[in-house]
């Protein structure tokens, strides 16, 4: 007589074991540290950690099974980022505690250098794109979202902030200068920064046509320490061209005067990969939670947000973050 042995079910302990296993390897812990405020593809992580693609893919699979990383497909590439800990769920507190300890790690110098190389490769690709398409910039921009499609919503949010008549503004990456006239009418002084001479020339021509005497154009990397500060910093459909968006927000925060605002207009996350080649986008939009998390990590407070659906299937997010008068405690 054959007796059937009941199969024991250990779903909860399996989940806990998976999390413990994922955190039990130094390379995986360093991968989590590298993903603290960035997203990388498999090939980029293989380059950063000087590891074969198959090896890094195995480690990422273990991290994904433990729900420590989330994936996002952009065209044929899959990008990895850290998953947020949900402390109300089973294993959530351990997940959060693990990430807190990981954030105390300092990545080896050679890993930091390779991350910088990956960022510079991304930045070079974006810079080369704008050098090539300056003459057709507006047509390229219109493929996704032209300024008239979201201008009223952006201006409505901007006007609701009630800046003083003496307030100043800084626009990063003004493109052909399409938003500069609106800023010039609302601020005493406007500074526009761009690292592309071709694009800055388009902005200069617009300022000349419109007689914008209170706009100053500077050929300068916005993340440069010599960049000006202002009461309102504007990133209008430009963050997706940054090599490291979270780091960009962190470095731009000191450019915002205390009590001032950061206005970000961006695409929500999408999967239309043609935007990379047609529009030079390094990122296919952003998750709403990611922008909020990056801003919070930089010491900014989330304020009003507006979301717009466009007829071509894209969604735009208009986000407002404020720099408090007193410094926040940033973990």
Task: List where the protein language model places each region.
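Amphipathic alpha-helical dimerization/coiled-coil segments
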Residues: 2-5, 89-136
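N-terminal helix-turn-helix DNA-binding core of bacterial DNA-binding proteins
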Residues: 14-55, 78-85
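Conserved alpha-helix/loop element of class I SAM-dependent methyltransferases that forms part
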Residues: 145-166
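Class I SAM-dependent methyltransferase SAM/SAH-binding core
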Residues: 170, 175-224
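C-terminal alpha-helical "lid/dimerization" subdomain adjacent to the S-adenosyl-L-methionine
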Residues: 261-320
